[in-house]
């Protein structure tokens, strides 16, 4: 069977023309109109937060949400965010109603960007009526940004990874 690949879409009149002999890979599909982009980006922020924002809110002592670690017990013992509730994804249907307040938003996390456990846990929680967000980067980025964490052997802390976080506590990434 002979299949032919279709050519990449050409920029439309609403996108700037590419320079040179080839069309822009970035602008092959033009950017969304501003109102559409704003709606999509607002919707993304309604579903996601990041480790720095979670850490800042937890530091207040009254974050207004419950943080849920959706990983296995072995992963939890290896390290978890202080103050998180351990609720493995597979246990959400049976235990969420007993462990979580349905009036309080829930933020889920798993290992890191390559794991969809937090997404699956958030879906299961949303299907039970909980308001949910995922913590982007998961536990991996919590550690890489230098935030303290707990293990089965006690508290730990790692130096921030310069590729993911400012090296000095006084610095702010500007996000």
Predicted regions and their residues:
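Flexible, polar/low-complexity N-terminal or interdomain linker segments that lie immediately upstream
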Residues: 1-78, 153-175
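Short active-site oxyanion
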Residues: 61-67, 82-83, 105, 130-131
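Short loop/helix-cap segments at secondary-structure boundaries that form the rim of catalytic
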Residues: 76-82, 97, 142
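A contiguous binding-surface segment within folded domains or other stable secondary-structure elements
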Residues: 81-90
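Short, hinge-like loop/turn segments at secondary-structure boundaries
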Residues: 85, 103, 149-153
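Alpha-helical scaffolding within the catalytic cores
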Residues: 90-96
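Short Asp/Glu-rich motifs
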Residues: 95, 144-145, 161-162
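Catalytic cysteine-centered active loop of the rhodanese-like fold, especially the PTP/DSP P-loop
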Residues: 97-143
């Amino acid at each position: 069977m002979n299949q032919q690949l279709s050519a990449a879409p050409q920029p439309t009149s609403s996108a700037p023309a590419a320079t040179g002999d080839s069309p822009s890979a970035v602008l092959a599909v033009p950017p969304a109109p501003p109102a559409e982009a704003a709606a999509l980006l607002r919707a993304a922020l309604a579903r996601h937060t990041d480790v720095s924002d979670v850490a800042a809110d937890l530091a207040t002592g009254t974050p207004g949400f419950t943080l849920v670690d959706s990983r296995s017990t072995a992963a939890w013992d290896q390290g978890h965010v202080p103050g998180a509730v351990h609720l493995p994804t597979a246990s959400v249907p049976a235990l969420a109603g007993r462990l979580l307040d349905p009036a309080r938003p829930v933020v889920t996390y798993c290992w890191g960007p390559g794991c969809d456990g937090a997404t699956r846990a958030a879906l299961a929680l949303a299907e039970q009526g909980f308001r949910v967000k995922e913590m982007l980067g998961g536990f991996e980025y919590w550690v890489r940004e230098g935030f303290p964490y707990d293990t089965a052997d006690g508290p730990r802390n790692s130096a921030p990874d310069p590729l993911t976080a400012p090296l000095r506590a006084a610095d702010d990434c500007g996000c």
